[in-house]
UniProtKB/Swiss-Prot annotation:
<comment type="similarity">
    <text>Belongs to the D-alanine--D-alanine ligase family.</text>
</comment>
<dbReference type="InterPro" id="IPR011761">
    <property type="entry name" value="ATP-grasp"/>
</dbReference>
<keyword id="KW-0133">Cell shape</keyword>
<keyword id="KW-0573">Peptidoglycan synthesis</keyword>
<dbReference type="GO" id="GO:0046872">
    <property type="term" value="F:metal ion binding"/>
</dbReference>
<keyword id="KW-0961">Cell wall biogenesis/degradation</keyword>
<dbReference type="InterPro" id="IPR005905">
    <property type="entry name" value="D_ala_D_ala"/>
</dbReference>
<dbReference type="GO" id="GO:0009252">
    <property type="term" value="P:peptidoglycan biosynthetic process"/>
</dbReference>
<dbReference type="InterPro" id="IPR011095">
    <property type="entry name" value="Dala_Dala_lig_C"/>
</dbReference>
<feature type="domain" description="ATP-grasp">
    <location>
        <begin position="112"/>
        <end position="307"/>
    </location>
</feature>
<dbReference type="Pfam" id="PF01820">
    <property type="entry name" value="Dala_Dala_lig_N"/>
</dbReference>
<dbReference type="GO" id="GO:0008360">
    <property type="term" value="P:regulation of cell shape"/>
</dbReference>
<keyword id="KW-0460">Magnesium</keyword>
<feature type="binding site">
    <location>
        <position position="274"/>
    </location>
    <ligand>
        <name>Mg(2+) 1</name>
    </ligand>
</feature>
<keyword id="KW-0547">Nucleotide-binding</keyword>
<comment type="function">
    <text>Cell wall formation.</text>
</comment>
<feature type="binding site">
    <location>
        <position position="261"/>
    </location>
    <ligand>
        <name>Mg(2+) 1</name>
    </ligand>
</feature>
Amino acid sequence: MMALQSTRDPKEFGRVAVLFGGKSAEREVSLKSGAAVLAALQAAGVDAFGIDAGDDLLQRLSSERIDRAFIVLHGRGGEDGSMQGLLECAGIPYTGSGILASALAMDKLRTKQVWQSLGLPTPRHAVLASEVDCQAAAQMLGFPLIVKPAHEGSSIGMAKVGDVAELIAAWRAASAYDAQVLVEQWIQGPEFTVAVLHGEVLPPIGLGTPHTFYDYDAKYLASDTQYRIPCGLDAAREEALKVLSARACEAVGIRGWARVDVMQDAEGNFWLLEVNTVPGMTDHSLVPMAARAAGLDFQQLVLSILDDSLEAGN
C-alpha cells in the first residue's frame, strides 16, 4: 500500500495533462473538477496544463509532449475505459483505474452482478426495456423503487417512483440518457459515501438532504446538503462499512482512488449502490472532504492521486 501523502519532487512527474470536460452529461461538473485539480497541481510546482477532451483530443495527445495524464473526466468517454484505452495505446501513464475496472464500474448492472457473485449486498434489481418489463419489475420488487440509467453518474436521469405509472414515465425519461435502464429496490435509511485512496479507506461521510435522495442538485448546487464526519455510526458499524467498501473496490479491480456509495436499511444492514472511479473534485465534492478528515489538504490529495501514475506503471 502506498503512503497517502506524496513525497516526490513535483518535477518528477514531468509534463502533466489534466483531462477534463469531454462530451458526457457530466461535462459541467468535470470542467469544475478539472479547473480545481489543474490549479492545485500548478500551485504545487507541477508542470501541468489542461486539455478539454473534445474532437481534437487525438491531435492534442500526439502533438503535445505529455509525460502522464491526470484524468478528471466524469461519465462516458472518460470514466468508462475508453480514455484509459486511448492513453495506453498512446503510451501515456494515467491516474486511477485501468481499462477493465473503469468499464466495469461504469456499468451499474455488471458491477452489481460481480458483487452478487461474491456475496456482497446490493439492492435487488431488474432491467427495463419495455412497459411490460416495468409491470414485471413492479410485481417482483414492489414499491417504492428507484430508476437509473445504467451508465450515467452524478444521479443524472434517476427518479424515485411509487407506482407503475411513475415507473413507466421514469423509465422513458432515463432511456433518453441510456439504452439500458435499471430499477432497484428503494432502501429507506441513511446514505454514506466512502473514499478509498491507494487501498486505504478514508473516513466515511454520512449524507443528509431534504431532497428525495442525494440527487444532482443536492450534490452540486444545494446549500442545505448535510455532510457528517464522523459519519454517525458506532465504531463497530463504521468498521463494517469500511471493510465492505474496500471489498467492493477490490471486486471491481479499483486502482488508485475511488468512491463507494452505500445505503443502510432500518435493520442496520449496508447495501452497495455503485463505485465511482473518477469522483468529483469540486468544492462540493466528497473525496476532498474525506481526505481533509484524514489529514490531506486538496493539494496533497491531487499529488497523491498523481503519484499513482508513477507507481502503477500503466
